[in-house]
């Protein structure tokens, strides 16, 4: 049993969340107000705008209403909505022309920090600056929330493994799901299904040496390498095994995976020579959007396209399997709810200890508000 399990008999105590909490708009509203508005508020990574003058529009936040801007020694979150006629200014990502943010509609211009510079044909300067937010930074990850991120993660034992120094952003993907965001986190936080449901991942990692690390606002799973990557469990993972071993000259990696969850919705994943950040954004009680960022060491990002392709294909294979689990759980919970039944099973320790920790976190933070 893990340290968490030793504090309780997991099969006898039940911090499980009521089934209605996965479907109730009132609970969804409470989560937004008391969890997300008081959470770390992950914005993006510094590598999204790596050089001074670079910007990236965060399409998944407020319909592209904010842009991440590199202002030399720091990154800022600057409003991307013109103060004149409320038009979106910047698109996609790139470098600010002349170092200024200029709306294409009427040529209103702003500094890279949002200060209003010019309004053509106006006799008096309106002085309408773009709102700007300063950001916290941890391992290159940028936050605008109310948590003290450095304090929350000060004792994180795997911080050095999640160091993005020398890594480049490869791509950002968004995926929409038709289930509650908590269901996704639950599946991410339990290893009990890895063997039975993930033929590829289950032969890449082994949960036999699963180690947990837990803090008030996070948990970490570290799992080992399965059979020195000698027996791939799927054709897709076979390519990923081959690329990892080729790049490492036949030497297995030190870990199979490290999975950090920074509550409520930020996940950082370590795989051999890969770092992935994914962030869940609720869109109501039965919808959520996952924003996935892939980062690789510069050498791999620039010169190893086969490595990148194999890793992402393996990642997506596992993601599709996880989605099926989430859909099945959602269908089952809805069936019970419609039938007026409240049923919950036991937690398996240590493989579902993270789910216990998450359920206790949710109850602690919003229980009094729902």
Where is each model-derived feature located?
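Conserved acidic
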Residues: 23, 74, 314
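C-terminal catalytic domain of Rieske-type non-heme iron oxygenases
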Residues: 69, 79-80, 134-136, 141-143, ...
């Amino acid at each position: 049993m893990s340290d968490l399990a030793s504090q309780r008999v997991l099969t006898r105590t039940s911090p499980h969340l009521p089934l209605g909490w996965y479907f109730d708009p009132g609970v969804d509203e409470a989560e937004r107000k008391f969890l997300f508005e008081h959470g770390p508020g992950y914005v993006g990574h510094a590598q999204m705008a790596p050089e001074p003058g670079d910007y990236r529009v965060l399409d998944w936040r407020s319909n592209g209403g904010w842009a991440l801007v590199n202002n030399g020694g720091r990154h800022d979150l600057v409003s991307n909505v013109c103060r004149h006629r409320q038009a979106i200014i910047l698109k996609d990502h790139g470098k600010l022309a002349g170092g200024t943010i200029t709306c294409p509609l009427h040529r209103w211009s702003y500094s890279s920090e949002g200060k209003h510079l010019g309004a053509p044909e106006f006799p008096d300067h309106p002085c309408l600056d773009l709102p700007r937010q300063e950001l916290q930074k941890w391992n290159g990850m940028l936050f605008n929330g109310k948590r003290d991120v450095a304090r929350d993660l000060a004792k994180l034992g795997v911080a050095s493994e999640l160091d993005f120094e020398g890594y480049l952003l490869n791509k950002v993907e968004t995926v929409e799901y038709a289930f509650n965001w908590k269901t996704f986190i639950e599946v991410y936080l339990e290893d009990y299904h890895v063997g039975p449901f993930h033929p590829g991942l289950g032969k890449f990692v082994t949960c036999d040496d699963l180690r947990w690390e837990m803090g008030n606002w996070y948990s970490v799973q570290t799992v080992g390498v399965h059979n020195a990557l000698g027996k791939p469990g799927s054709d897709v993972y076979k390519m990923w095994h081959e690329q990892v071993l080729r790049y490492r000259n036949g030497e297995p990696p030190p870990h199979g995976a490290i999975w950090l969850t920074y509550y409520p919705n930020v996940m950082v994943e370590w795989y051999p020579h890969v770092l992935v950040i994914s962030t869940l954004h609720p869109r109501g009680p039965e919808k959520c959007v996952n924003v996935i960022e892939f980062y690789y060491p510069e050498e791999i990002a620039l010169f190893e396209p086969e490595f990148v392709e194999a890793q992402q294909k393996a990642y997506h294979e596992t993601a599709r399997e996880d989605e099926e689990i989430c859909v099945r759980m959602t269908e089952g919970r809805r069936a019970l709810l419609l039938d007026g039944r409240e049923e919950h099973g036991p937690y398996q320790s240590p493989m579902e200890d993270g789910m216990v920790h998450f359920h206790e976190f949710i109850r602690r933070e919003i229980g009094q508000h729902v």
